[in-house]
Amino acid sequence: MSAGSPKFTVSRIAALSLVSLWLAGCTSSSNPPAPVTSVDSGSSSNTNSGMLITPPPKMGATTQQTPQQAPQIQPVQRPVTQPMQTQPVTEQPVQMENGRIVYNRQYGNIPKGSYTGGSTYTVKKGDTLFYIAWITGNDFRDLAQRNSISAPYSLNVGQTLQVGNASGTPITGGNAITQADAAQQGVVTRSAQNSTVAVASQPTITYSEGSGEQSANKMLPNNKPAGTVVTAPVTAPTVSTTEPNASSTSTSAPISAWRWPTDGKVIENFGASEGGNKGIDIAGSKGQAIVATADGRVVYAGNALRGYGNLIIIKHNDDYLSAYAHNDTMLVREQQEVKAGQKIATMGSTGTSSTRLHFEIRYKGKSVNPLRYLPQR
């Protein structure tokens, strides 16, 4: 086939047309940026995608390198839970019973009147009015009245309480029975003198058997028979204080033997120091028998002395008195003669926090250790 023949010319034109069509297809397929979208779709069908895949991983590395969100576990919550676990430790000394706070204090192991800080006390955390009254040797009701504290006796940390008088001694404690002793001692002195004294202008003073309601400082003369009336007439220039024959309990006859006033363990001993216990405390059960420690006469039976509850005082002779406090029921009356071992009361908790007997012996108005007189057991 010659180059100038028509057939050759047609064949050449057809070949050129095919080449041009092929070239047109190549140029049209290279225009769209398909490799960019194939990075996200994961397509690898284009041969050019291998050259364009490398930039997107770099971009993906920069965008995916934000794992700052991983520390968003918020470790701040850990220190919040730890302090909450330590709070019950601070509350261990306190118990709740029936909605009330109960402090774990064993008053039998706490010396009564052991506070030596003077006439004031500063309230600390966990203090109660009864606890402060206990360690300062006071009655909690007197302490509340002295400091104008009303029920339920709420206290504030740092609050200052007056717990003693000007001399630093407790408001109550041993002072009450000491005053009763002084009243009795004055009567005994006048009886022993058997003298005649001048009487100035004064009203007639009468003591009778019904005077048991008066306070311990105005008790019946202990050497008078029950029902005797003593008068001091205003018109008489003098009055004789000569007493009738007194019974054996008003003499200085020695006491042959002392008896334990009740059974039980001594939970608080005698304290000779200032503000210490003026007798001994014996534990027991409510209703337990209380007996007279020796023969004598009841010179006081009542509850006028705060801090002692139902109190009985027995005069044994001119020198000795015995006192029985916190009784539940008193079975004797003032001016009644009693024998050693005679039941005079039942044990209780009046004026105190637990069932017990507070027992004292006084010699010439001074507190003495009852354990020196009671038989060993």
From Swiss-Prot:
GO terms for cellular component: cell division site; cell outer membrane; plasma membrane. A lipid is attached at C26 (S-diacylglycerol cysteine). Sequence repeats lie at residues 203-209, 225-231, 237-243, 244-250. GO terms for molecular function: metalloendopeptidase activity. The keyword Isomerase does not apply. Gene3D superfamilies: Glucose Permease (Domain IIA), LysM domain. InterPro entries: Cell_wall_metabolism_enzyme, Dup_hybrid_motif, LysM_dom, LysM_dom_sf, Peptidase_M23. Keywords: Cell cycle, Cell division, Cell inner membrane, Cell membrane, Lipoprotein, Membrane, Palmitate, Repeat, Signal. Residues 36-50, 62-77 have a biased composition (Low complexity). CDD domains: LysM, M23_peptidase. It is found in: Cell inner membrane. It is a lipid-anchor. This is Murein hydrolase activator NlpD. It comes from Salmonella typhimurium (strain LT2 / SGSC1412 / ATCC 700720).
